[in-house]
């Protein structure tokens, strides 16, 4: 297959001038030339999804550009890389081609929202979550393409768009990028980003105050609604009932619905079948954990955005160490930079590696250090920390202190109990188990634990 052709190259240059940058980079640039015979131009898209999207949305535009260049009518047909590979045993498998495709950051002409539009857009969107900052890899290519398609043409084919994937993989980023894109294109667009928890709280508040009419107006009179963490609808029967009717009202009016979840619709439990059916009626796109190449690109992009310089071997070390999600990866980057800045140590693998150990404090610390650091961090006195107080702020700080002491010292459970005012070893065991559970589901707890670990690391390093 000839991938470079003078005519297709000219057509691409023409389209580059007329299409938006994100449209060109996402749909036109990846298309490869296959053949041009008898006025028939055959192009190869990376996958079936891209092929179908090009056919439905860009065929006439490409044919018009080709006609202007060739001087006669040109018909364009699209095939996917996968279909081409079936016709030739010498072709590589599509999955291999996608995995080996160089990961790149997606450019967007509407990345940084203008200050004028920011002030008119009180919709809860995080200004950092734009397409420009999203690094596209094999793990997220489909979800990214679907998000862009919805941003460009809301309320059409992919309605709803259901984005699913594990914690910290970029679901919220893509959702909010759609919102930013629409607001930049149309400053008057009514865009609403909301977590399922907030939606639930609003419904409860509406019931208590007899104000459901206002709640319905709030959520049903929008052009684009972005619903995050829909899995938290599980078991909430009345909220599900309200969301069902809200979904129907939005869909019937042509408003775009984008939903995010930690699992696909068919794996959600405790949610009405009629809702599951509606979640599945549009497009479902999942995001997988990023591969090594993508993780490296993410760190390089973050370093560029933060105007920081990290040695390549340190970037590769972090990328190889933190593999499960992007949030954890970027957190490691931030901690490495902060650690080197505070301690004055060089940015090398040797100096940073111990601090980035996700399973331990990294150096042995004393029980007193743990108690003092937890006390300072949570603004709880040491006397309260080792007392029997059951106030939530105190008990939570105490549990985290017990967890850190278990992983940062060589003390047994009974000895840890002694350090916390003579608590029973079963109390210590329960506290550790509770923290371990929360670490996987509560980003706030995970962040608090990690920050205290880093502070303990810094203190210990200063004393070496």
Swiss-Prot record:
UniProt free text on domains: Domain I is involved in oligomerization and binding regulators, domain II is flexibile and of varying length in different bacteria, domain III forms the AAA+ region, while domain IV binds dsDNA.
Subcellular location: Cytoplasm
Similarity remark: Belongs to the DnaA family.
Cellular component, GO annotation: cytoplasm; plasma membrane
Source species of the chain: Prochlorococcus marinus (strain MIT 9301)
Statement: the UniProt record of this protein carries the keyword Protease: no
Annotated ATP binding sites: 168, 170-172
Membrane-spanning parts: none
Gene label: dnaA
Protein name: Chromosomal replication initiator protein DnaA
NCBIfam families, per database record: DnaA (TIGR00362)
Region listing for Domain II, in residue ranges: 79-123
A GO BP entry: regulation of DNA replication
């Amino acid at each position: 297959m000839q991938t470079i052709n003078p005519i297709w190259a000219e057509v691409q240059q023409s389209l580059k001038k007329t299409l938006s940058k994100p449209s060109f980079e996402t749909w036109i640039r990846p298309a490869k030339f296959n053949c041009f015979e008898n006025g028939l131009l055959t192009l190869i898209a990376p996958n079936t999804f891209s092929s179908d999207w090009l056919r439905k949305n860009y065929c006439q535009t490409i044919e018009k550009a080709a006609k202007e260049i060739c001087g006669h009518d040109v018909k364009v047909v699209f095939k996917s890389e996968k279909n081409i590979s079936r016709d030739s045993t010498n072709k590589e498998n599509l999955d291999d081609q996608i995995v080996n495709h160089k990961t790149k950051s997606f450019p967007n002409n509407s990345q940084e929202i203008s200050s004028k539009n920011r002030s008119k857009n009180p919709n809860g969107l995080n200004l950092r979550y734009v397409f420009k900052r999203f690094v596209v890899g094999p793990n997220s290519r489909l979800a990214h393409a679907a998000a862009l398609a919805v941003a460009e043409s809301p309320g059409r084919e992919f309605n709803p768009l259901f984005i699913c994937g594990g914690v910290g993989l970029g679901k919220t980023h893509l959702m909010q990028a759609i919102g930013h894109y629409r607001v930049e294109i149309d400053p008057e667009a009514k865009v609403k980003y909301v977590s399922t928890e907030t939606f639930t709280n609003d419904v409860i508040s509406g019931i208590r105050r007899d104000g459901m009419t206002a709640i319905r107006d709030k959520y049903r009179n929008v052009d684009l609604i972005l619903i995050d963490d829909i899995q938290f609808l599980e078991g909430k029967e009345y909220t599900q009932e309200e969301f069902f009717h809200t979904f129907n009202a939005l869909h019937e009016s042509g408003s775009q619905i984008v939903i995010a979840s930690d699992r696909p619709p068919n794996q959600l439990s405790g949610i009405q079948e009629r809702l599951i059916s509606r979640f599945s009626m549009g497009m479902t796109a999942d995001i997988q954990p990023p591969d090594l190449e993508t993780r490296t690109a993410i760190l390089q992009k973050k370093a560029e955005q933060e105007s920081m310089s990290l040695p390549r071997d340190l970037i590769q070390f972090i990328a190889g160490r933190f593999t499960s999600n992007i949030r954890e990866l970027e957190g490691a980057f931030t901690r490495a930079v902060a650690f080197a800045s505070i301690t004055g140590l060089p940015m090398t693998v040797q100096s940073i590696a111990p601090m980035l150990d996700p399973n331990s404090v990294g150096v042995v610390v004393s029980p007193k250090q743990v108690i003092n650091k937890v006390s300072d961090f949570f603004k709880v006195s040491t006397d309260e920390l080792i007392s029997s107080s059951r106030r939530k702020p105190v008990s939570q700080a105490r549990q985290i202190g017990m967890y850190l002491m278990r992983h940062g010292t060589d003390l047994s459970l009974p000895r840890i109990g002694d350090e916390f005012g003579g608590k029973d070893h079963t109390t210590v065991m329960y506290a550790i188990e509770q923290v371990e559970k929360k670490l996987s589901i509560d980003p706030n707890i995970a962040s608090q634990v990690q920050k205290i670990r880093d502070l303990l690391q810094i203190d210990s390093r200063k004393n070496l």
